[in-house]
């Protein structure tokens, strides 16, 4: 498996490049809206962020727990802990030390998004059992001739375009068994002997992350942001 730090090490260059390109594109696309206007400056100066903080102690406790969870994410490979356990553990500790009622916290969970992913993973599991994904993996290998570079390029391009229109998490969940099937194929596995890791996973991650920036529905974080924006107007 690939731990958090290994993934971050290999994906950081992509993040930096993507962020730089995105900033340039935003400045070009929204150049009219980004111009300074006197009324907007006055509105910003009139804002008082302290008034929005209802409980400063809760904010400090939450920040400490969030920081601890992020650090644990970085160390989970060394500690041999699953990231899901770390995340749930952080949530449990926060509930205990803040005294927030569990039902009150659960009320703010984005249940529609979670149920959507639950249903999606069930469908992906069913398609995998049917053998359709394995057949698709063999078709990809036939198309690329088993060449490592061509296979990585194909996975990256397909992932980038598909993730722009299909949320990158469900798309990645669908592609995982396909990449696994390609990796263990006898005609292709010999290409991976020179690597300490499977480069196909990074090709998939690169394409899915890149495509997730393409549209609002390209990433689950975008969907959550939209839901929160709709809730608070």
Name each model feature, range by range:
Residues 5-54, 64, 206, 210-233:
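Juxtamembrane and boundary regions of transmembrane helices in multi-pass small-molecule transporters
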Residues 56, 60, 69-88, 96, ...:
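Flexible hinge motifs at transmembrane-helix junctions and intramembrane kinks/re-entrant loops
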Residues 88-95, 178-179, 228:
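Hydrophobic transmembrane alpha-helices of multi-pass, membrane-embedded glycosylation machinery
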